[in-house]
Amino acid sequence: MAENWKNCFEEELICPICLHVFVEPVQLPCKHNFCRGCIGEAWAKDSGLVRCPECNQAYNQKPGLEKNLKLTNIVEKFNALHVEKPPTALHCVFCRRGPPLPAQKVCLRCEAPCCQSHVQTHLQQPSTARGHLLVEADDVRAWSCPQHNAYRLYHCEAEQVAVCQYCCYYSGAHQGHSVCDVEIRRNEIRKMLMKQQERLEEREQDIEDQLYKLESDKRLVEEKVSQLKEEVRLQYEKLHQLLDEDLRQTVEVLDKAQAKFCSENAAQALHLGERMQEAKKLLGSLQRLFDKTEDVGFMKNTKSVKILMDRTQTCTGSSLSPPKIGHLNSKLFLNEVAKKEKQLRKMLEGPFSTPVPFLQSVPLYPCGVNSSGAEKRKHSTAFPEASFLETSSGPVGGQYGAAGTASSEGQSGQPLGPCSSTQHLVALPGGTQPVHSSPVFPPSQYPNGSTTQQPMLPQYGGRKILVCSVDNCYCSSVANHGGHQPYPRSGHFPWTVPSQEYSHPLPPTPSVPQSLPGLAVRDWLDASQQPGHQDFYRVYGQPSTKHYVTS
């Protein structure tokens, strides 16, 4: 309010020429006021008639510049309002010996300044229920309300500023607003900021972990992509090998055709060579016979002439058949090769596409229906051996790796009582009957080592026995075994059970200290042949909250 009044008042004290507060104001006959220096400079620039810069009234001669005394006094008082008074020096009220020292702290509730050496002395003085509120002496002016000249000890929730009690309760600007003590609000803000700081630190740590995981995943993907590139290169080398094989077969076709032609050509040449030898032989005989005709005694016997003439007539009587020459139709052969090239080019020119994206970003922790990250970490800590359920290697993983989610967390969804074959469900490889989540004893591990022998038990007719290694109970692989009661429990099962993740105390450790991984099935069966074999089918301890398969 006071600030607005000052601004409005200042607008009436501004010179129209320099637009600042009047400096030695003078008044013209038209009753307009200007700074003496401003109006003098304005008229000095105008060589013609002098005019009032505000109303443009012309004067034949320059009027006298009379000082406006009333306006001068108002300007001086207005300027005095803007002059900040030097703050009064505060001295310690507890200094008794010698002159008091300058105050370093001021208690806003007690309004008592104190020096640095008497801060503890002041804090030990009795105060209001809210206690002392010390601030720096230099900040006292900032904590003072300019309107009521009182310390601002309250915090307005509506406007988020510190206010004094008069602003809150006595028709002040913050009347009706929700306020609280400034120290209480400060503690609340500190708690809120500390809580947010913890959240931000956790978020920063989470982001840092995710960045590390992203970097690790990047390196892993780069390695796998490099492996994939090598495999792709090998595949393309196989394609090159196929092309080389096709080229070899094509060249082989040409070689076979050439060999066939050369064979036919050689046969023709051989036949013509034989005809030539025969003709040369007859020609020689004919020449010798012609030489004999010079003697008249030749005419005594001319039978040789007739024989030679007949043979010559036979040789020359038939015409020579034209030879068969080779005709290579290269265009026809190249057309067939061009067809293959066209088909291959058409196949390779198409974009390389896969049915689904082969490299994509997926959530880091895929959430199951009945699982959570905390449970997974808890389970992995309690049962590190259960990791074989997630792999396909080993006898159990190969048989029950895809048996569903009933035992994926190693936890039964039903309360555990005396075990029956309808609890802790998994699917056997050969059927869909629900059985205990445990491996079937391999037939090869029984005493005689036969691959066809089944564990023959007198009271259970040779049915396969399934083991739940957490609840330490047995059941038959047959889901409905004629209404047979669950196997009774006992405290004589020969292995120790880990105590972590159990919601109940375990009974004393059995007398046999051998652990499950070191106990062979043969030892179990040997133990079943002893007089106390009925305890072999009983369970050890109380039901646990988790069931998982073991081998």
From Swiss-Prot:
MF terms in GO: protein homodimerization activity; transcription coactivator activity; ubiquitin protein ligase activity; ubiquitin-protein transferase activity; zinc ion binding
Region (Disordered): 399-457
Annotated zinc fingers (RING-type), start-end: 15-56
Comp. bias (Polar residues): 405-424, 446-456
Coiled coil: 181-249, 274-295
Metabolic or biological pathway, per its Swiss-Prot or TrEMBL entry: Protein modification; protein ubiquitination
Null allele phenotype: Mice are more susceptible to LPS and bacterial-induced death. In addition, TRIM8 deletion plays a protective role in hepatocyte injury triggered by hepatic ischaemia/reperfusion (I/R) injury.
Family matches, as Pfam families: zf-RING_UBOX
Tissue localization of expression: High expression in heart, liver, and thymus. Expressed in embryonic CNS, kidney, lens and gut.
Function: E3 ubiquitin-protein ligase that participates in multiple biological processes including cell survival, differentiation, apoptosis, and in particular, the innate immune response. Participates in the activation of interferon-gamma signaling by promoting proteasomal degradation of the repressor SOCS1. Plays a positive role in the TNFalpha and IL-1beta signaling pathways. Mechanistically, induces the 'Lys-63'-linked polyubiquitination of MAP3K7/TAK1 component leading to the activation of NF-kappa-B.
Known partners and oligomeric status: Homodimer. Interacts with SOCS1 (via) SH2 domain and SOCS box. Interacts with HSP90AB1; prevents nucleus translocation of phosphorylated STAT3 and HSP90AB1. Interacts with MAP3K7/TAK1. Interacts with PIAS3. Interacts with TICAM1. Interacts with TRIM15; this interaction prevents TRIM8 cytoplasmic translocation.
Domain notes per entry: The coiled coil domain is required for homodimerization.
Protein's UniProt name: E3 ubiquitin-protein ligase TRIM8
Gene transcribed to yield this protein: Trim8
